[in-house]
Swiss-Prot record:
This is Tubulointerstitial nephritis antigen-like. It comes from Rattus norvegicus. The keyword Secreted applies. It comes from the Eukaryota. The gene is Tinagl1. One of its GO terms (cellular component) is cytoplasm. Glycosylated.
Amino acid sequence: MWGCPLGLLLLLLAGQAALEARRSRWRRELAPGLHLRGIRDAGGRYCQEQDMCCRGRADECALPYLGATCYCDLFCNRTVSDCCPDFWDFCLGIPPPFPPVQGCMHAGRIYPIFGTYWENCNRCTCHEKGQWECDQEPCLVDPAMIKAINRGNYGWQAGNHSAFWGMTLDEGIRYRLGTIRPSSSVMNMNEIYTVLGQGEVLPTAFEASEKWPNLIHEPLDQGNCAGSWAFSTAAVASDRVSIHSLGHMTPILSPQNLLSCDTHHQKGCRGGRLDGAWWFLRRRGVVSDNCYPFSGREQNDEASPTPRCMMHSRAMGRGKRQATSRCPNSQVDSNDIYQVTPVYRLASDEKEIMKELMENGPVQALMEVHEDFFLYQRGIYSHTPVSQGRPEQYRRHGTHSVKITGWGEETLPDGRTIKYWTAANSWGPWWGERGHFRIVRGINECDIETFVLGVWGRVGMEDMGHH
């Protein structure tokens, strides 16, 4: 009793398949020709690559071609052609009836021979056979890395920072860091240990801006100046002078003063050492950022000299200095010189750093920056393994310096508790968490607990009264 309906069902299915086949044929016959404006990718090997030439009409004898479909069957050679570019030469042994496009196609536009466009950090050049050749440099903003980090359970989110788009990873390392690793003698300088009182317990969270409101300054932007040595030093000194003067002096100190005037074994926007920066702040001092503003974010060209020093001072006795030059910023009159006492190194111990930070203010830390750090947007950073299987040029790192401002803990959705440091970078407020980042605490992540420095602002009673 089921025979008749089953036969009818099979007949209907066969009819539907035939209709779909006719629709497919109609779509091909009604499609516009692929080469009406000339053959694009005239040197491409399509039929030849697959060793495919088909007789008559064979709709399955097809290959993808620049977002469309091309064919290697005899039927393609009709008035409105949808043949693959090498069909005539490879299958028929004759020249193609359409002229090759004199240039290369990209995003609907034809570029002339030797024309170029940029694909992120790589330049693509149109060559004579209508083919693009692109550089293969690792880019600072790597969309594949961003996806891999955000798919993984790493505790932080990555994203595209528009200021980094178009830069190579090598340029990021060269221009966005700039702290030269200290010499072995400096790395071996004696560590200072603080003393925790009996039964003293440090809080689980602390932020310098909460203990010293209005005395902790926001991050600046070093741009493409490899001057983190100057920016982090000025940032820590600014906060410490403000704290130790009890708010009587709250300067944002000038990184440019260090970049241009601290020239002994320093390279300005091409890198510098922390010990040299602190020596200069102790012996010479610097003015405020308003008085001597950052003069530009592109001071790293090897052929261009560091901008000349525009701030000079003289000794006043007892180590104090007085400016002998007017402010480079003619709109500012105050050219007060700010100084610090000798810098000291903290023990490479989590609690030692916490105690110092809580009692005396933000500290300066050296750290190793890896390729994924540039992509940080939010969360608790730790270096990820997403680039481990890639060539060495995709796995780069360099030395940087930052200002640690606090610490805390966070419980993740899986129940794990992660301890972290809060730190201020020098890439501007658009990067990370309003210019700051959090990084795993207690395991020396990226060597951030290896070389940590503190200092006292040089503040006398005359300074308190003067200000």
